[in-house]
Amino acid sequence: MTPASFTPLRDLPPASGWGRGDVLVLFGELFGRGYANGLIDAARRAGMTVVGATVGRRDGAGPLRPLSDPEFAQAETALGGKIVNVPLEAGFDLEPPGDGPSPVEQLKGVRPDAWQTPLDWSLVERARAAGARRLDAATASFAAALAPLVPSGANVLFVHTMAGGFPRARVYMPLMTRLFRGTGEKYLSSEAFWASDLGRLCAASFEEVTARTFRALVNATAGLRAGDRRVRYVAYGYHGCEVLAGETPTWQTYVPYLQGWAKLQLEEHARDAWREGVRCTVFDAPEIWTNSSALFLGVELSLYALLRALDREGPRAPATEAIRARCRALLAPDGSLEGLLERADAYLAAPQWAPFRRLEGWPHHSTAAQLEAMLSASEACSAMSADPRNPVAGELSRAAVEAVGRLMLDASWEPDAPVRWLGHDVVARRLIR
């Protein structure tokens, strides 16, 4: 794998040439609001047509199927555009290997305190191969169904949104709680878990869902790259983020980020495609607050530093003043933005956590002390918002989603590298200008 070299986008890209008649194609299904919504909003403002996708559905433990007519109608209404109804579920956790139980079936009845239970890896590998074949066939069908929806001469922007891949076995959820929120006796070392068979299964599943899907997309859509049309690919990565901790630009990361190894594979697939002449970029985006953040407490700590980046880039800019005002309105009576930043900095800039701020060796595993310090900082900062369901971090996330969408749309027109970091500096510049 190519060693990581820090390649941040520093300057605002010029306005793109995407416009009316061009098509943005989602490869992955939208559930709730997240980064992809910012790019969709920017594309629609440019006049682009948006075409969506689905991962399909399962009825209980039944086989994967397309959306039913009511599900399909509801999905198209929610997207506000057409959806290609080919089930693109990636991964292999429910995949029967042909002559034995699926990985999830192997784990049926395993208790959380038996997380070191061994798996039959010959069955796991056969299930993985079967899942990969299923996805490749589905992606080819997706590309064939998509082709008539792309007008002749239209430019196309593919947006890879596939991520995740936690195996759907009951044993995992209590383990995830211990891994990401456990302190004291409930702490579970991410390194120890990652070395177990359950951890290895997670790693393989993440790679199939988060990373290999990008390669499958590029391969299946080769036909659309023929001719004079401009075809670009973007994907959402994460590889830490540079923020202002105090007054110092600092690369930092959420720990433990178990999908990190799969995100590295995603970057590698983009580099391989770039060398083959495919214009694509994985954008390593900042941390935001999403529906899943309740499990990953602490991921939002670096987000508060966006306020400091806005102050540095344009302290009196209308966007800076508006965002600060909206954030202040969400504070508890005894909270302040200055207090929020000070408490977040106490974790982000603490000397004892400097080893976790090294790009080299990323992703990093947790320690009991580091996780406890991060969770304590998260709890203290969250308490400064009046409503935990509408926190300051949520407002800053909405700003980041908007800016990242605009940055990705513009940068994708003439991409200059297969991997680009988006730090708070360029996000703040985009919001201000």
Go through each PLM region and give its residues.
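A glycine-rich helix->loop->beta "capping" turn
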Residues: 100-160, 165-166
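Glycine-rich phosphate-binding loop and adjoining beta1-alpha1-beta2 segment
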Residues: 49, 53-127
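Short alpha-helical segments and helix-capping/turn motifs at coil-helix boundaries
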Residues: 8-12, 34-39, 138-148, 156, ...
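Canonical Rossmann dinucleotide-binding motif of NAD(H)/NADP(H)-dependent dehydrogenases/reductases
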Residues: 3-61
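Short acidic, low-complexity segments enriched in Ser/Thr/Gly/Pro
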Residues: 91-123, 167-200
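Structural motif
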Residues: 22-23, 154-157, 232
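Catalytic loop of short-chain dehydrogenase/reductase
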Residues: 58-66, 170, 174-277, 282-301, ...
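Long, compositionally biased intrinsically disordered regions
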Residues: 2, 6, 13-14, 299-433
